[in-house]
Amino acid sequence: FDRITICNGILHHEGLSPEKRLENTSIVPLETVMRINAFVPLLWVKALKPLLKVNKKPCVITALSARVGSIGDNERGGWYAYRASKAALNMLLKTAALEYRREAKLVQFLLFHPGTTDSPLSKPFQKNISPTNLFTPEFVASQLMRLQGDLKPDLPIQFLDWLRTQG
């Protein structure tokens, strides 16, 4: 393996939508979003570890994160489950990256914020997005591939967006 991309995630589906207010939160949606967005990627990283410990070439494990998971970048509030799940993903994979650095030295992690991508995930929320800030899946994939091939080798994990801005 030289590149592994974990690109699962959920923001909404039938009966589940981002919470605008604290009063809209409840345990089942919080658990569902956390499980899908944070725990599933961690379990993939766990399952891959035995294979990557014996891998003889550098490998980048990428997970799709989101800037809304940043504590410092949260200026608007809302979206409790999604924000918390992406913050948890960032911390879980940072912790895993440190462990990998000790046991699978050729593995690096990239937490990638793709920006708002024209996809079913963002479709209900695109009305407030400028066309210049709504990216095609092809553009996002090309930016991701470029970043995966150009990481700083001395860092076990990097948080980058499509412009290579540190997140």
Where are these regions (language model features)?
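Conserved beta-strand scaffold in the Rossmann-like NAD(H)/NADP(H)-binding core
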Residues: 63, 109-111
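Active-site-adjacent helical/loop segments in soluble small-molecule enzymes
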Residues: 115
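N-terminal Rossmann-like NAD(P) cofactor-binding module of classical short-chain dehydrogenase/reductase
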Residues: 4-5
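Catalytic loop of short-chain dehydrogenase/reductase
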Residues: 10-14, 18-36, 53-103
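Conserved internal alpha-helix within the Rossmann fold of NAD(P)-dependent oxidoreductases
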Residues: 40-45
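Conserved Rossmann-fold cofactor-binding substructure of NAD(P)-dependent oxidoreductases
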Residues: 1
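C-terminal helical subdomain
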Residues: 111, 119, 123-167
